[in-house]
Amino acid sequence: LQFSSLDEARYHETLSASAMTSVKDPAHVLVLGGGDGLLAREILRYPSVTDITVVDIDPDVTELARSNRLLKDLNHASLSDPRVKVVNDDAFTYVQDSKATYDVVLIDLVDPSNEKLAKLYSTEFYRNIEARLAPEGVMVTQATSTFFSPHAFSTVASTVAAAQPDRQILPFSTNIPSFGEWGFILSTKTPQNLISQPLPKGLTYQDRQTLEFIMRTKPARTEAMEPSTLLHPRIVEVYNQDMRQWRYY
């Protein structure tokens, strides 16, 4: 678990709203990571949603999110909602083997700090995700800090672009006081649908004006980087080089 209850809504509302407002009546949603139930909480605000699949490798995390009183209060008991199915599996394996189709895929995985995590930021991973998307489906992934790890952020953008050449890639960011400026990458085949659907009730941070600003008016800048692959997991080296100057140990 890695969030502050004081400002986690900035992250989860942005990650979810950027995709959910860019697909007409999204019904089927896949969450990769998100075992704390906070992203599922946000997705359940959208009345068109019929099912959410949360794929998190750690059963202890998802059980804690279901049973801990404080976490349940924060995630609104989202993982116990009948529309939510929890799958304790590796995200890479799941999208590789799954035959399901989703309107929205949201990726809420930890940063690529080691080789075990590199596959979750590879062209192969993003290519498998594209195969799971409906024709007008949208994918959004968290993409590390645009301030602390700008080259890693750019590498994620370049990797998604290489894996999904027929889709438009949109990098953007929002400020989260606990973590700083945080980056996201959206991919879509229908950019004309961006932020075309209404936001749900109950949001504490995100609104249409803010969403328009971060996604259209001032999208995050990236530079061309070599894509990260299973054979050449460049993202790990780039991420750790970015972070080295900020570490005190």
What are these model-derived regions, one by one?
Residues 1, 141-142:
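Acidic/histidine-rich, surface-exposed loop or edge segments in extracytoplasmic proteins
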Residues 9-141, 147-156, 161, 178:
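The AdoMet/dcAdoMet-binding core of the Class I SAM-like
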Residues 1-7, 11, 167-249:
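Soluble small-group transferase modules, centered on the S-adenosyl donor enzyme superfamily
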